[in-house]
Amino acid sequence: MRKLSVLLLCTLLCPVLLWGCTGQSADEYAGETITDLKEGDPSAFSRLLDAGLEESGADFVIQCPEEVKEPYLKFLQAAFASIEFEVASASERSDDVYSVPITYTPIDLAQTVGAANEETAADPPSADFTETMLAVLEADTKLVADDPVYGAETTTDLTVSRTDDSFSIAEEDLQSFLASALSGYMTPYDTFGALYDMQDFLTSYLDASFKGEVAQFALHTDRTEDEAYEWYLADTFDPPADLSQAYVARYQAAMQNLLKQSSYTVGTPRLEPGLFSYQIDVTITPNNSLADAYHEFEQGTYYSIDEASEALVAALEKYAAAPTYGAETTLTVPVNMETLSTADQEGSDMATLATTILPSP
């Protein structure tokens, strides 16, 4: 009976003894998790990237291209792999819940890649947002491996829980830890997202102003599409004060059609030193139709307001149907807080852009 009791006791204790001998501790699990983050599937950084894109995306209308996400995850993993971590012994907080201190020196990605990104943004390699981001992330991934810049040493406590025979790290703790270790990790996207979002804004501004295509402009300006369309109609199509009422509707329709014939292409912005400052080349084929219509109208002699009104509207309709253009030209437009705040003032940079696209009579 005693021998049987001893055997039974050994049978019961054996799993516990084996756990103590070969089982994993909470701090070992934390260390292996860090190694997996450095060497395993980069998709482990997906939640961190998604959170960063959501926060940065609140400032942009354009969205992160899907093709950019995988290289961005590899960039984050390369940055994380450059950091040395010291895992201290775990302390038990409560039953099967442990605190594991991790000491490390975070990489400062704003300092590591920021200057190189701004230099690239001053002369972007492509007019395409995706192509530029792919090139930038390739260069930045090399930078974090070759010349990383670090911040001040810090310690993060990870909460590690044991369930049955496995451990897990609290997801909130893990994401906070990754964000702390990768300070400024959205620097590439913030730099170039702002650049190409500005290109999209200026294009949408011109499309709304000249063509009445307001959907994208509404997004950029926090308007509804109806509000943006009212902005488009305001003042622009007011007829001359002495135009006969019978010709007002035709005048407005002719003007809208004439403006829609305007031709321009907004180039890739170039970042300038300072906050929110860009230079943008706009390639324009001047729409001379309005000036030519008025010139033709002014050659005639009219003996009544109705006769003059009919002639003016007829000239506008003629050139709206068969527009005339000048020689292609490129205008460099500075875009910053000052130029945007003075856009509706005569002689401003934005007003000059408008009159280059559609010369006044």
Task: Please give the residue ranges for each predicted region.
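Positively charged n-region of N-terminal signal peptides that target proteins for export
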Residues: 1-12
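C-terminal motif of bacterial Sec signal peptides marking the signal peptidase cleavage site
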Residues: 18-20
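Core segments of small alpha/beta cavity-forming domains
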Residues: 22-82, 86, 181-257, 264-265
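A broadly structural signal marking compact, well-ordered functional cores
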Residues: 24, 225-361
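Surface-exposed, charged secondary-structure patches
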Residues: 67-137, 246-312
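Intrinsically disordered, low-complexity segments enriched in polar/charged residues with Gly/Pro
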Residues: 74-77, 144-148, 253-256, 319-322
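Short beta-strand edge/turn micro-motifs at domain boundaries
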Residues: 120-135, 141-193, 300-307, 314, ...
